[in-house]
């Protein structure tokens, strides 16, 4: 049974991402036979939980120039106008509000707006709340994992090359994976 935003451990306040214990990664079909993977090294996430859960907000920003696939030439190509066009669009953002967040136990669904290369489209993130704890240092922490599938063409990321054997170098569907730990601000 799906509930509202309220979760048994719902706590009002401002939560900030703990970058050392968090990650944003992606994968996309490559050469029609495997997947290429990468990460974004610099990002920020702020969640403001409200007394009125529908007024809760999630705001995330990603420095797209921080893309890292482990191959410098590919990373530079991803930063170019063929892909992220970081000189003109240095930041990718995601925003969501409480009326678009639902829980079913620890499982959640978030519908929000992703903006990439100046183009905004709604996306759906599904995931699981890992828990909420009081850490040994006097902080309240929450952890969650989630994923979303986006079509890169929707955001004007259309570069591709035909393969001699048929098909294309890159698939259109990109899976974005989130592994986040957030800390309640005092």
What is each PLM-predicted segment?
Residues 1-186:
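Low-complexity, acidic/polar, glycine-enriched regions of mature
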């Amino acid at each position: 049974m799906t509930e509202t935003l309220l979760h048994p451990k719902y706590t009002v306040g401002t939560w900030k991402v703990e970058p050392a214990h968090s990650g944003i990664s992606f994968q996309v079909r490559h050469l029609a036979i495997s997947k290429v993977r990468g990460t974004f090294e610099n990002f920020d996430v702020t969640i403001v939980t409200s007394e009125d859960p529908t007024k809760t907000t999630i705001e995330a920003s990603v420095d797209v120039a921080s893309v890292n696939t482990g191959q410098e030439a590919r990373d530079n190509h991803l930063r170019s106008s063929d892909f992220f066009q970081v000189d003109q669009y240095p930041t990718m953002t995601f925003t969501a509000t409480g009326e678009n967040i639902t829980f079913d136990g620890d499982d959640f669904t978030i519908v929000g707006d992703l903006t990439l290369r100046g183009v905004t489209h709604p996306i759906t993130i599904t995931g699981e709340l890992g828990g909420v704890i009081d850490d040994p240092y006097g902080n309240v922490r929450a952890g969650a994992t989630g994923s979303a599938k986006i079509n890169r063409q929707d955001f004007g990321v259309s570069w591709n090359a035909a393969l001699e054997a048929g098909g294309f170098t890159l698939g259109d569907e990109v899976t974005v994976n989130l592994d986040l730990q957030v800390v309640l601000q005092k």
